[in-house]
């Protein structure tokens, strides 16, 4: 399980400018518990950024949902086909109550059709 299944530091979206670029020029999709913005990048891999607002949860809830989203990305990043993207996931109220399986189903449904193709 080593190698591509790890969540490496270069796969994290860090710079504020990158978050703004994805928000400005990227595609937006909303689900019941998440807002997802994504835009193509020029890198040989996907990158993940998280937005979890303090006003909705205490620290335990915020950290729980961030862990579950990172785990979804770590396990499924190879299932999201090229072009490689910067992905920003914004957690919405109620997301902290989702199981890891529910998070995976909801986020993966954004990127894949029922037959496995990218949207």
Swiss-Prot record:
Region (Disordered) residue ranges read 1-24
The terms describing its cellular component in GO are: ribonuclease P complex
Pfam families recorded: Ribonuclease_P (PF00825)
| InterPro entries in the record | Ribosomal_Su5_D2-typ_SF (IPR020568), Ribsml_uS5_D2-typ_fold_subgr (IPR014721), RNase_P (IPR000100), RNase_P_CS (IPR020539)
Which Enzyme Commission number(s) are listed? 3.1.26.5
Q: Which reaction does it catalyse?
A: Endonucleolytic cleavage of RNA, removing 5'-extranucleotides from tRNA precursor
- Signal peptide start and end residues: none
- The UniProt regions of compositional bias labelled Basic and acidic residues, in chain numbering, are 8-21
Q: What processes in GO biological process is this protein linked to?
A: tRNA 5'-leader removal
- Enzyme class at the top of the EC tree: hydrolase
Q: Which residues cross the membrane?
A: none
Among the GO molecular function terms of this UniProt record, one is:
3'-tRNA processing endoribonuclease activity
Q: Which UniProt keywords apply?
A: Endonuclease, Hydrolase, Nuclease, RNA-binding, tRNA processing
Q: Which NCBIfam families match?
A: rnpA
Family, similarity comment: Belongs to the RnpA family.
What is the stated purpose of this protein? RNaseP catalyzes the removal of the 5'-leader sequence from pre-tRNA to produce the mature 5'-terminus. It can also cleave other RNA substrates such as 4.5S RNA. The protein component plays an auxiliary but essential role in vivo by binding to the 5'-leader sequence and broadening the substrate specificity of the ribozyme.
Q: How does it assemble?
A: Consists of a catalytic RNA component (M1 or rnpB) and a protein subunit.
Protein name as catalogued: Ribonuclease P protein component
**What is the organism of origin for this protein?**
Syntrophobacter fumaroxidans (strain DSM 10017 / MPOB)
């Amino acid at each position: 399980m080593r190698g591509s299944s790890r969540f490496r530091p270069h796969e994290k979206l860090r710079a504020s400018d990158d978050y703004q670029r994805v928000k400005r020029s990227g595609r937006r999709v909303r689900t019941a518990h998440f807002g997802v913005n994504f835009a193509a990048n020029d890198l040989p891999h996907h990158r993940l950024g998280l937005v979890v607002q303090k006003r909705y949860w205490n620290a335990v809830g915020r950290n729980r949902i961030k862990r579950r989203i990172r785990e979804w990305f770590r396990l499924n990043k190879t299932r999201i086909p090229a072009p490689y993207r910067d992905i920003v996931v914004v957690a919405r109220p109620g997301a902290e109550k989702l199981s890891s399986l529910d998070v995976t189903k909801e986020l993966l449904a954004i990127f894949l059709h029922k037959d496995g193709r990218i949207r």
